[in-house]
């Protein structure tokens, strides 16, 4: 565990109420990076922002955004501050995202209606997974589909063949996370990961945290 991180946490903790620290610990103890999701070139800020809010509420520590064609912008009226409590990782293209996630041990799972796709309820949860979501009109790029280890679909029983992106993310992530919480899989953050996130949260809570942290080295 990083001693510098622990030192900064110790200093900032003096400026946070016990009630707030307890709330932070409660959230940290339920955070996970075993599952994450990736948005590829989502152009509607309202939809993209809604997915960030969903990810934070469900307990994800990280989400990922590919910005090859469309820049990701947050709508504060939709995120309601959720973006400050989650790590938002951005990439210039799909390859960078895929390479990073694979190096971190994630299976690449593409949401798709192609014949190889399995139903969501049949997707196994034995490995870390990064679930990729594309636009409602065109779906994921050929690059992502070609690199995917697995393909998954949400069953649909009506005439329309596409869920709203924010709804799709909510259905998939909620389903997988509920199954994880009922399993014996060690899916929660380890102590080092919690410390790094704790420091992020403390910095969100403490005003002028940079000035306070600078005093550590003075």
UniProtKB/Swiss-Prot annotation:
It is an enzyme of class 2 (transferase). It comes from the Bacteria. GO terms for molecular function: tRNA (guanine(18)-2'-O)-methyltransferase activity; tRNA binding. It catalyses: guanosine(18) in tRNA + S-adenosyl-L-methionine = 2'-O-methylguanosine(18) in tRNA + S-adenosyl-L-homocysteine + H(+). InterPro entries: Alpha/beta_knot_MTases (IPR029028), SpoU_MeTrfase (IPR001537), TrmH (IPR033671), tRNA_m1G_MTases_N (IPR029026). Its EC number is 2.1.1.34. It holds the Pfam family SpoU_methylase. Keywords: Methyltransferase, RNA-binding, S-adenosyl-L-methionine, Transferase, tRNA processing, tRNA-binding. S-adenosyl-L-methionine binds at residues 111, 154. CDD domains: SpoU-like_TrmH. One of its GO terms (biological process) is tRNA guanine ribose methylation. Belongs to the class IV-like SAM-binding methyltransferase superfamily. RNA methyltransferase TrmH family. HAMAP family: tRNA_methyltr_TrmH (MF_02060). Catalyzes the 2'-O methylation of guanosine at position 18 in tRNA. This is tRNA (guanosine(18)-2'-O)-methyltransferase. The lineage of its organism: Bacteria, Pseudomonadati, Spirochaetota, Spirochaetia, Spirochaetales. The gene is trmH.
């Amino acid at each position: 565990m990083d001693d510098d991180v622990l030192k900064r946490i110790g200093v900032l903790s003096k400026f946070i109420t016990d009630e707030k620290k307890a709330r932070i610990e409660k959230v940290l103890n339920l955070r996970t990076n075993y599952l994450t999701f990736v948005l590829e070139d989502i152009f509607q800020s309202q939809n993209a922002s809604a997915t960030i809010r969903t990810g934070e509420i469900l307990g994800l520590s990280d989400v990922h955004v590919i910005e090859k064609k469309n820049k990701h912008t947050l709508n504060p009226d939709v995120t309601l501050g959720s973006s400050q409590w989650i790590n938002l990782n951005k990439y210039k293209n799909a390859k960078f995202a895929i390479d990073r996630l694979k190096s971190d041990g994630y299976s690449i799972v593409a949401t798709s209606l192609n014949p190889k796709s399995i139903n969501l309820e049949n997707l196994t949860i034995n490995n870390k997974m990064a679930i990729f979501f594309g636009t409602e009109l065109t779906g994921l790029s050929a690059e992502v589909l070609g690199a995917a280890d697995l393909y998954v679909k949400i069953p649909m029983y009506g005439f329309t063949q596409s869920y709203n992106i924010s709804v799709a993310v909510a259905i998939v992530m909620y389903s997988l996370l509920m199954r994880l919480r009922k399993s014996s899989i060690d899916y929660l953050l380890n102590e080092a990961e919690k410390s790094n996130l704790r420091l992020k949260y403390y910095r969100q809570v403490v005003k002028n945290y940079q000035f306070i942290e600078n005093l550590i080295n003075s």
